Every structure is written in structure tokens, then in C-alpha cells.
């Protein structure tokens, strides 16, 4: 075993990572099928070829599996470090893309394909970290586990949630690194910024259902179900959200430059939700013939709440805003767990911060919260410090690829992310880091 850091040919590593990601995104693991048998086999083959033990966990749903790889410490002095990513991806319509979304095309310095950023790129960064630890004979002070899950894009019923509920003893980590935050370039006056998520917004999904007497479309009236529903929706969507700073976002604003940073956050679509609860109208239905005013109509809303928002008080406020006996407010989903914010002093956060600044010395590393949902919440709910960061440095144009058209990961960011995760892992799990 070696106790110092061997020299690494990062050009060769970058080429290998690019090839791996190109092959990985060629495997269609999109929903609604969300099959991960082939993706797990792809990762397991690369790990096993270099003597890294893997185990595949078959979930109760056919075609959906989770993969665990482990590098064991001879004399562990702490619980494992867990590197997490998900193998499933959202759908893509090939006709709308520059390249086929499952081609893995490498062009213009990017790997194109659905999942290249969310979240197969992260998976390859973690794969390369495991391979480098093994190849370089790094002596470990704790086990390092790589977890690749299914079902993250639909709430993880057969993925991280199922693993935590049924196989937690096989993981039992001290710290978890997952997706949820990113490095951003060109967003802040303060310069490059790595936003490390230490918590995430919680989700409440509600449905407004309007009921009234039906009738002929030639004779509309004020209290028709569709009219009631539209008025209720306007009331809800027009309500100004109250801005407030959670502790993590307050620290973020401080590190990025105070009030200037607050204005920058508030002006950007991707970061504005950090400051308040959000309500998005996502589904509408009602009616069955164009000349009939229906007796029922409904709208569904995806609501994302700041970690300190009381979800029942939030729903109660929605009911007061709607205030129409002909419109009911139904809760489709409550948050799965209470919010648990990871600390941003010491531990894995400090290791991430040091690693990021090793490669980008002038960058700002700051805690933040994830405005979406990730697998990390299932580990945070167990009290495990869990951090989200895909450690590339992304532009606004890059970030459009998340669930969007022409999703792509730059070769440069794949390299940077691998360097940062490997460096972080050495700081957390190597007996000697130099």
C-alpha cells in the first residue's frame, strides 16, 4: 500500500472518463421503464475488472436494481464515506435534439446525451475515483462505498429509499456525497462559486378540485366549475411569496458578497427559489366535449417549501386563499421526512471546500440548499451529514441541459469533477493525504 499520493496522468484519466460516460449514456435507462439492469452491469464490469467487489441489489420491481461497490480499509477508524449517484434518467424526444439523446456523441468538447449531467456524469466521476484509489494502492482509514441507484427521478421508491429502508446495514455511512449542488460560472459578481447543498426544499403536492352544475356552453355562468377553478388558481399563483433567509442561504449570501449577491440570486430563475416557497401549476384537466361546461375540473400544483416551512400551515394558508366552498384543496403528497441540515464546518464539507480550492483557488465555496429533490434526503433523515455537489464549473447554457434539450457534460468538467471527488476522498478516507 502507498501512503503518499502517486502522480496521476490526468490527460489519460480524462480520456478514460470521457469514453466511460459516452458508453454509459448510450444505455437507455429512462422512465417510465427506468430499467437499470444494464447500467448496473456496465458499472460493475468496469469495477470488477480491477478487483473492486460489487453487489447488485434487486428491488421488488423487475428491471430495477441498485449497485454497491466497496473498497475496504484494513483497519477502519471510522464509518464509510459513501459516494452516491443515480442511474435512471428522464425521457428525451430524439427529434428535438442535435444528436440522438442516447448516442453518447462526443463533439465540441462535450459528451452529449440524456443523463450526461443528471446524473451519469457524477456516476463516472465516482467510478473513476474508485478506480484511481484501487490502481494507486491508496491505504484507507475508512471504507469507501460507491452507490448507484434506480428511481431517483420518480422519488426513489425502489432506489435510495428502498436501500435505506431495507439494506442500511450494508451502507451505514459516516458521510454521503451526492448530487444537488453545482459549480457556477458567470452567475455572481464574486466569481466562480461552488454551491454545496446541505439540505433541500421539501415537496407538497396539492390538487384543486372544482365542482358545480354542468350545462350548455352557450349559457355560461359565474359559478361554473371551470370558472371557479380559474379564479382559485389566480388567487393562489398571484399571492406574493414571502422572502426569508434560511441559515444556509444567509451564509451563502454572506460569502458571495452580501446584498449584491442577494439581488443576483433573486434575479435568476434557477436560484430565486432559494429565497421563498414556490407554487407551480403543472397539470390541468376538465371537460369532455367543447360545447359542454363540465361539472368537475381540477388543477395540480407542485409546491416546494423551504426547510423551515411548516407544511400543514402552508396548506392551511392555501385553503384560506382559495376560500371557495365549490373548490376543495386536496393534498396528494406530504413531505416524506423532516428537514435535517448538514453542518458546513469540518468533516466532508471542509474536505470538499479544500479540494475545490486546490483546483480553483479563487472560487467561493458556499453552503446552499437544493431547490429540487435528491436521494440525499433519505440519508439526512437518518442524521447522516449529506452534501450535494456535482463539482464541475457550469455556465447558464450548460445548466439548461438538466432535464432539457441537448443535455451535455463538458470533457473539462468531467475531468475537474473527477479531480475534486478523488481529492476529497483522499482527504476523508486515506491514511495519509499529501
Predicted regions and their residues:
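Metal-dependent amide/peptide-bond hydrolase catalytic core
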Residues: 1-5, 12, 60, 182-190, ...
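Acidic/His- and Gly-rich active-site-bordering loop/insert found
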Residues: 2-114, 135-142
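Loop/turn elements at helix/coil->beta-strand transitions in domains of secreted/extracellular proteins
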Residues: 50-52, 79-80, 142, 171-174, ...
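Cysteine-centered functional microenvironments
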Residues: 65-68, 110, 115-116, 182, ...
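Conserved hydrophobic/aromatic beta-strand scaffold that supports enzyme active sites
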Residues: 66-70, 176, 207
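Short beta-strand segments
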Residues: 84-86, 148, 178-179, 209-211, ...
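Acidic/histidine-rich catalytic neighborhood of metal-dependent amide-processing enzymes
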Residues: 111, 117-195
